[in-house]
Amino acid sequence: MKKFLAFVLAVLTVVIMPLEISALETVEKENEFVTLPEKVNELTPLRTRKKVEGLRMYVDEENPLFIIRNCPIYTGDLSAQTFASAAIKTYFALPQDVRNFAVIYIDEGTTYMTPQEQLDFWDELLYLTDEAGVPIVCQSECFCTNKQRDPFTEEQLSGIFERHTSFMGFVQVELSTNGVTNEKLAYDEVTEDNGVNKNILARLKSCIRACKSNGGLFIWQDMEYIYWKKANYVNFILQDKELYNLLKSCTENVIIMDKHNGHGRHFASQSNIMGCWLDDVCGNWGVNLENFLWYEEGFKEYDDIGVAPNEPDFAYTSKYPPALYGIDMIADLVGGATVYAIEGTFGRGGLYYWVNGEVVMTATFNDVLYPFYQLVIGGAVPDKEQVKEKIKVAYKMTSPATYALSGNDAHILQGLYCDSFNFFHENFDVRSNPYNDCTKTWVPSTGRYFIVPILPIHSKPKEVLPDSYVLNDFTYFIRLLFIEPIKQIFFNQKYKKTYEGDGVLFDINDYIYIFNSNENKTINSNQTVKYTLPESGIELRTNFVAHTYAIFDESEDKISIDLCNLRLDTDDVCAGRENEDQFMASFAAGGKMSDPQNFRQSVIELSGFEAEPVVRAEGSNGAKLRKEWNEATKTLTVTTISNGEVRITIE
């Protein structure tokens, strides 16, 4: 898949639009650090989304979707015209290669408008985006709507599609915050409290039907909490057979996204949603990144376990390193995720800021998101069959509350690539315990076990994963006896070790991804990886500190490396010496990236060359690089000191 797309893009470059791509500068000096030339983001060869009859927007691994919220507006005129203008400006601020696969997400009004006010707001906004040709999705339900306002009818939702060519679909988010109750799960009875329809299922189904009948997208973003009524949430709701069948009947319209928020259970959330995709409950799955996670998990400063969930000041969300967004996306891309979104405080996660009435992208976009989006556009996302080949073990849900799937995170995942939690952590709510109702972890600790999917209750595992060992409640007990060492032996037999070291490595679809798994620890955070590159046989060794990742691509006797470790200077805003606007104004102008502590060393060692290779490189934010060649061992060592992105080619 990747090689085919690469060929197509190469032809497009030559035939359709002769882009001038700047070559990386050759590093001539040996054994001393040199400052790299400033990298320049160039457009990839332009292509457009595939059109499919009956669908307003088709999405797959070759046609990804980047969901971009409009640059935020918090004060002044908050009319539909203002938000339409912001949406249009945000859309056209995106580089054209990304813009061709993007949609603007409007979430305004959900928490305070009545249904009729919301419909009028959408109409007023969408008439303007229709004229501008800007694709839009709108949020129809969120964490509080089922408690605060009456539901939309299917006819009302369909009317939005019928009246607006720029409208692509509806988004529903964070339904898990309401929990579930068994007695309300299996039917659509309308329950009312002060005139408000509280039945989430009915709202889901009417929206899905409206999207299905109008060729629109139905996007469901959700997460999990440790409380049992909010665990395995997506598959918990899919016990409803009518909902399950409805989603499968319009799978190409449906996107389910792992919302990186909530208290703990981030790995179970990923497994449940990926399992839905494997079972064709949704045609695509993805991830919604957010720096709120720092707040939800109770983190404050680095190297501090923090406090209970939701206790830090919102200012501490700025501590979420932009490089972690890249790591989060990689952890889902390898599992076939095709849809990516970002939100949060500080310019929607530090993404952009208003400067003289225009949207200016920050280094979070330029050094992290944009290179990643270009990678995805270029064909990096594996298709479903490639993903299935990596899955040796899966789990078929029979009950959402079973032991294997319960806990601070699903017990089946604990001790594999997810932390283990003791009896005290999982059974006692002590407010002084910083682990109370959270896990403090969301980055996988190893790539050995890939991702263990959790299949829906109504799935047929032999049809979904015929070549995988699919556990269920009965076999989990019989084979593993709920004993951690036995489980470890079982998984080690199924997943052979492919690399050495305590870092994380994934190799799929001709790309190799390596990252450090520490979320909050920065002191003594080094992690190493040793791996043999499959095409050249070159032995690769890396030594990365926290908040560092690299993407390796072997092709045509060349190794391309994209390394990123961006972290921001946040001391002033966290101490209250500046506010969010002041912080973002500085960041958008190129500031907040100069703290010497954030310039960290990364080491990449490659052995097995026949002769000394040529090294070319460029970087952002004053990155430095040193190359060392050992003629006796035919080993090249590349060391960078950086806080941003570094691009290296070795040939």
Task: Show where each model-derived region lies.
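Positively charged n-region of N-terminal signal peptides that target proteins for export
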Residues: 1-4
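C-terminal beta-sandwich/jelly-roll accessory domains of carbohydrate-active enzymes
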Residues: 412-651
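Conserved, function-critical positions that sit in or immediately flank catalytic
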Residues: 8
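Mature N-terminal, pre-catalytic/accessory segment of carbohydrate-active enzymes
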Residues: 13, 18-135, 159, 551-554, ...
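Short, hydrophobic/proline-enriched secondary-structure or compact coil segments at domain edges
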Residues: 22, 393-398, 559-565
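Glycan-processing catalytic domains of CAZymes
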Residues: 30-503
